[in-house]
């Protein structure tokens, strides 16, 4: 039998995801077998579980924190927005249906049963399960249909922590309002409050602590300091709104990323941020970097249409003529071909559209979705690297270019054990792949960065691998959480 703990929030981006990761790492370091859990997540950022199922990247990252293989049971229901108020619903890792909100709520009981199945599985196999809620736990217009917050605590008999972000202001009002809008049966599940992202002397909060406990009969059990040095993957595209430049601001290597309207799996870029200056560009911006990344997207045809509308397609060809390096990942890779065939409008309202015509390749969209972990040998001219990643794509591609990767496991372009395309036009290198996570492979990432440095006659660099940096930050987070929160009322 597992002990269940739940972290709910007063709002989105209050710190739930990071707090769950920190608690998972803290408990596993104490010798327990720990699992993260989020009953329902909405995100275009997803990864592949050990069962070859699709789960949100947040629960994948939390599994890393817990030092366990990521499972479909950590995120039984995943909603992937497609536009026009429609989401693709993923249940236990596999596509279920495309649904709007009204259709989804009519099948709420079905999803609840799947959530219960996962709770039962986790209860039997772990010592602790740390649950993450979604958004605000008290959207009073949605409470009857909310299967992502305190309903889950009720089902799992979990003790709940309410976290609020003081950096936004109004933290005590947010806590008080949330508690007093909750039904009594859910209010009783709250065992403590945690205040996140505090800067300064904690003494200034003590009067507030006393008053909020007096008003709610629930104590503040922790205050987490604001720490800008932590490097952890972001959960969804809301985190990159307004974000323009990040990474190593002193690096001589500049990477531009097209900020697609339906950008997905942008955590693919994280491994480069230690070595490179990273810059998002809009469709009407100039390309100023050494490397241009066309990232994953939920709607490749929509992005291709926007690139044409704002003239980015022409700028990309100019960039190639100047010797630029281009890297397309999944949906971004598809746009590099001659044509994207979407007769059933499965990608959006654009339909079939001509591509950038960099690769001699045709991509056709259908109903089948590749969801799998993949590995193989990546070959560039006389260089070879062992690489691994994961695939999440609905299109299949017929490419007449040199394959980038020979797969030993995976689907790739066409299910023929070849993935991606590679082309060199004079001093310009163009790479394309369906493999997300490919930049987590240190040797290939190092090759890509040093390709730019060699063009500039600069010394090669070799930083710590991404996995090592991530693990170090998980341990740092765990220490902060353990020192900041009194768990005596929870554990």
From Swiss-Prot:
Keywords: Cobalamin biosynthesis, Glutamine amidotransferase. The active site is at residues 330, 436. It comes from the Archaea. Pathway: Cofactor biosynthesis; adenosylcobalamin biosynthesis. GO terms for molecular function: ABC-type vitamin B12 transporter activity; catalytic activity. Gene3D superfamilies: 3.40.50.880, P-loop containing nucleotide triphosphate hydrolases. SUPFAM superfamilies: Class I glutamine amidotransferase-like (SSF52317), P-loop containing nucleoside triphosphate hydrolases (SSF52540). GO terms for biological process: cobalamin biosynthetic process. Residues 252-444 form the GATase cobBQ-type domain. Catalyzes amidations at positions B, D, E, and G on adenosylcobyrinic A,C-diamide. NH(2) groups are provided by glutamine, and one molecule of ATP is hydrogenolyzed for each amidation. Belongs to the CobB/CobQ family. CobQ subfamily. This is Probable cobyric acid synthase. It comes from Methanococcus vannielii (strain ATCC 35089 / DSM 1224 / JCM 13029 / OCM 148 / SB). The gene is cobQ.
């Amino acid at each position: 039998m597992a002990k269940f703990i739940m972290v709910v929030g007063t709002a989105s981006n209050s710190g739930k995801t990071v707090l769950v990761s920190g608690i998972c790492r803290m408990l596993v370091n104490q010798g327990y077998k720990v699992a993260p859990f989020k009953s329902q997540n909405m995100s275009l950022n997803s990864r592949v579980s050990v069962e070859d199922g699709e789960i949100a990247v947040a629960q994948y990252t939390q599994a890393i924190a817990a030092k366990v293989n990521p499972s479909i049971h950590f995120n039984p229901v995943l909603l992937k927005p497609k536009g026009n108020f429609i989401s693709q619903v993923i249940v236990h890792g596999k596509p279920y249906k495309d649904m709007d909100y009204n259709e989804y709520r009519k099948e709420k009981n079905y999803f609840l049963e799947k959530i219960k199945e996962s709770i039962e599985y986790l209860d039997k196999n772990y010592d602790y399960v740390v649950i993450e809620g979604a958004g605000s736990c008290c959207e009073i217009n949605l409470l009857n249909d909310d299967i992502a917050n305190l309903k889950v605590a009720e089902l799992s008999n979990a003790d709940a922590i309410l976290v609020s972000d003081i950096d936004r202001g109004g933290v005590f009002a947010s806590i008080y309002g949330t508690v007093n809008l909750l039904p009594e049966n859910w209010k009783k599940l709250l065992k403590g409050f945690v205040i996140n992202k505090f800067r300064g002397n904690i003494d200034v909060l003590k009067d507030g602590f006393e008053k909020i406990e007096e008003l709610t009969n629930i104590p503040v059990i922790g205050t987490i300091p604001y720490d800008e040095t932590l490097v952890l993957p972001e959960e969804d595209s809301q985190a990159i709104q307004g974000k323009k430049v990040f990474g190593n601001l002193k690096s001589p290597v500049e990477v531009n990323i097209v900020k697609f309207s339906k950008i997905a799996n942008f955590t693919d870029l994280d491994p480069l941020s230690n070595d490179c200056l990273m810059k998002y560009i809009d469709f009407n911006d100039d390309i100023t970097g050494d490397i241009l990344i066309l990232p994953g997207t939920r709607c490749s045809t929509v992005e291709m249409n926007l690139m044409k509308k704002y003239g980015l397609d022409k700028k990309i060809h100019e960039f190639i003529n100047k010797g630029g390096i281009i890297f397309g990942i999944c949906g971004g890779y598809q746009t590099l071909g001659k044509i994207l065939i979407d007769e059933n409008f499965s990608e959006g309202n654009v339909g079939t559209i001509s591509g950038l015509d960099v690769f001699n390749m045709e991509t056709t969209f259908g109903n089948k979705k590749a969801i799998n972990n993949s590995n193989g040998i990546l070959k560039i001219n006389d260089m070879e690297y062992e690489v691994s990643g994961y695939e999440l794509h609905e299109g299949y591609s017929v490419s007449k270019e040199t394959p980038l990767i020979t797969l030993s496991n995976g689907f790739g372009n066409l299910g023929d054990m070849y993935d991606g395309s590679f082309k060199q036009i004079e001093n310009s290198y163009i790479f394309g792949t369906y493999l997300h996570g490919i930049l987590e492979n240190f040797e290939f990432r190092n090759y890509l960065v040093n390709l730019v440095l060699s063009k500039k006659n600069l010394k090669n660099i070799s930083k710590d691998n991404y996995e090592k940096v991530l693990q170090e930050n998980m341990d740092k987070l765990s220490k902060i959480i353990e020192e900041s929160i009194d768990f005596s009322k929870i554990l």
